[in-house]
Amino acid sequence: MAANQNVTKKKKAVIGGIFKAELNNFLMKELAEDGYSGVEVRSTPARAEVIIMATRTQNVLGERGRRIKELTSVVQKRFGFEEGSVELYAEKVSNRGLCAVAQCESLRYKLVGGLAVRRACYGVLRFIMESGAQGVEVIVSGKLRGQRAKAMKFVDGLMIHSGHPVNDYIQQAVRHVQLRQGVIGIKVKIMLPYDPRGQNGPRNALPDHVQIVEPQEEVLPKEPHSQHKEEKKDVQVPAAQPVAPVQ
């Protein structure tokens, strides 16, 4: 019985992962021009809530919510949901400079527009670092100039590559661009800043993080004064009595 329950949970997890991957691929194509940055699925017994994260939420919603209703209808038909069992919401990305997906899409549109690779990458690098990131790494690979494919890496700031903090501090995204000379691959990695509030970065500090506490200002006395301390009284210890020898 327990084995059947485990298999059922495993199948349910696989189905949920496939649904999220297909939904992400669908929304990536539909909302590419609207700053699509990711999707979050919250499933309840009654219905499923799909939260679309984008930089331009007004374009996602459309005039009087028309576009979000059309997307809801398409998702219901494409993924076999019953009518009224799925709801789509749009959430604005608070700081798009720290969103790897948004910056990857921004770099993709710059390359499609004909901007030079080096200039486009340095522009994205500068914008991410000005947004408060600890570090950034941009890799562009493919036929960039000649017929031979190569990769160009642009790095700035601090970047960690191993350990458990990678799961909390590193955001990465991969996109592909179809240009005239061939397909160009783009990879953007951003190291988020430490934020105790949890808004722009993780709340957990790095293991090697050292916080220096500012010393308190010493309050100087305005007038001369003296302190009288009570003197400790000497406690007299009774002298040891001689012990009579044992005969």
Swiss-Prot record:
Give the Pfam families listed for this entry.
KH_2, Ribosomal_S3_C
Q: Where is the KH type-2 domain?
A: 23-94
The annotated region (Disordered) lies at 216-247
GO biological process terms held by the UniProt record:
positive regulation of apoptotic signaling pathway; translation
Q: Which GO terms describe its molecular function?
A: RNA binding; structural constituent of ribosome
Q: What is one cellular component GO term in this UniProt entry?
A: nucleus
Q: Where is the composition biased (Basic and acidic residues)?
A: 219-235
- Work out whether the entry's keyword set contains RNA-binding: yes
Q: Which InterPro entries match?
A: KH_dom-like_a/b (IPR015946), KH_dom_type_2 (IPR004044), KH_sf_prok-type (IPR009019), Ribosomal_S3_C_sf (IPR036419), Ribosomal_uS3_C (IPR001351), Ribosomal_uS3_CS (IPR018280), Ribosomal_uS3_euk/arc (IPR005703)
Alphabetically list the UniProt keywords: Ribonucleoprotein, Ribosomal protein, RNA-binding
The UniProt regions of compositional bias labelled Low complexity, in chain numbering, are: 236-247
The UniProt similarity line reads: Belongs to the universal ribosomal protein uS3 family.
**The protein, known as:** Small ribosomal subunit protein uS3
Task: Please give the organism.
Answer: Caenorhabditis elegans
